[in-house]
Amino acid sequence: MRTFEKKQILKNVGSSWSALAINVIVGVFLSPFIVHRLGDAAFGVWVLIFSITGYYGLFDLGIRSSIIRYVSKYTATDDREKLNGFINTALFSYTGIGVVSMVLTTLLSSSVERFFKIPPEMHAQARLLLLMVGASVSLGFPLGVFGGMLEGLQRFYILNWTSIGATLVRAALIVYFLDRGYGLLTVALITVGLPILSSILRGIIVFRLCPVPLGLKYVDRASFRHMANYGGTTFLVMAAARLRFRTDELVLGTMMSTVAVTWFNFGARIVDYAQEFVSSLAQVFVPMSSQSEAVGNLDRVRKIYIAGNRVCAFLIFPITAILIVFGKHIIRIWVGGRYVPHSYPVLVVMIIPFALMLAQAASTRILFGLGKHQTMAAVTVIEGVGNLILSIALVRPFGIVGDALGTAIPLSFTCLVFLPRHMKKQIGVPVGTFLREAYTLPILLTLPLVAALLLTNRFFYPRNLIQLVIETLVVGSVYMIEMFWAYRTHRAFHVAEVAGLTEPLPAEQPPQAVVSVEYQGEQ
């Protein structure tokens, strides 16, 4: 890999991990602070309303990914006319979508308590909260063009650093106002207002980097066609991702209570942090595989497939072990011991299938990079529908654990049965070869860590966050020493010549559009 590629990857991934670290740290301290100030019911309403408006992301219709694609393309070819047309067409389209979503928000806010089990005393707050969050999301559509432009220009680090700034300011303001007796709506105003300000800042920055004239005269049909053709599969993936990972709170809010939403959220939130950590790395495999395929180097694609998934496994396997063994301590110290009986089972049920998915995070990115993601999108839709049906069926007899099982069962099937076989068909690496080359070393290195975790958990009981962090770092040093050995001996990233181990590929298909999608909580 060329030096500038390595620097770009390190810069973008490093800033992504920095943003994630800040989000985790803020979340660790802010979530219990908010829930203890507002109460379980109010916090559950908060999570529920954000879950509802999260579905507005489907109105994106794949436009964001097309912005990334065509900004990258037109800046590379220095085609200013097409770039101007595309950006203005995207802004025009997003403005229309924002208006529609605001109308929908107004309609929903008048009857939100009819659909969800919200305490009567919180009906008025829930309506106002939905209006505030919905308005922010609606405005976020046209403002999101600026973030898409930055991604197309490969300036992920600008996105990440502006996000870090907004996160820190948000945390400080929430603590300040809650300490002075303000409530749910004040927290909401802070939470939805700062992303708008950061988007405006990104717009100022991106127009200095890449000046684009604005006006209706630049809107054109050709750009509409490009967006429609490119965004179709992206929309399917986005809809499927919502079904997979964003229906749990709605099912619980409809069939149980907002308190159950709070219990579920604490266990699932920890899993989300693990997912974001791995996904921040995995996103670099989209352009890497796309570039390799473009020059006909499929052997390099196969090596990315094995080495990329191995790196993902190096990250998620030890994280999974730590969360399962220390999970009760994490929840107890984070939000309080009374949440452990409810939230820890959710954590365990969710982290295992998510580990299976994240250990193959490179696989899905390679499919997008090669433009061979259509079958995966269809399977994901089927999985999402199965997720929703199972969650509804299991939540009555098993409560929030049943809801978690509704997500875990179909996700495990996709990861264990479908994905490795589908990758074999697409790039020709036999399943046995893939499993052996990608996962033998990560599993062997994780086993001593598991033993150390179990031994430590038996004899030591962390009573506060500092003790928990120290205990985790001491035990984690076992794994770090092993990883240092694997790196120094070149075992960590070495991949044997795989060309001779592969099965013949089917006849090459014409290249499809490459879609850059950040999975939701695969975000």
Predicted features along the sequence, with ranges:
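Helix-loop junctions and terminal segments of transmembrane helices
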Residues: 61-77, 91, 152, 210-211, ...
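Hydrophobic alpha-helical transmembrane segments
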Residues: 131, 160-209, 226-230, 381-389, ...
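Interhelical loop/hinge segments that connect adjacent transmembrane helices in multipass membrane
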Residues: 1-9, 202-245, 284, 288, ...
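Interfacial segments at transmembrane-helix termini and the short loops linking adjacent helices
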Residues: 109-133, 323-355, 427, 461-462, ...
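Alpha-helical transmembrane segments of polytopic membrane transporters and translocases
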Residues: 44-60, 89-93, 136, 196-197, ...
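Signature of the first transmembrane helix
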Residues: 8-73, 96-106, 136, 171, ...
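Membrane-interface junctions at transmembrane-helix termini in multi-pass inner-membrane proteins
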Residues: 10, 138-163, 175, 182-185, ...
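Membrane-proximal transmembrane or re-entrant/amphipathic helices at the cytosolic face
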Residues: 427-431, 453-523
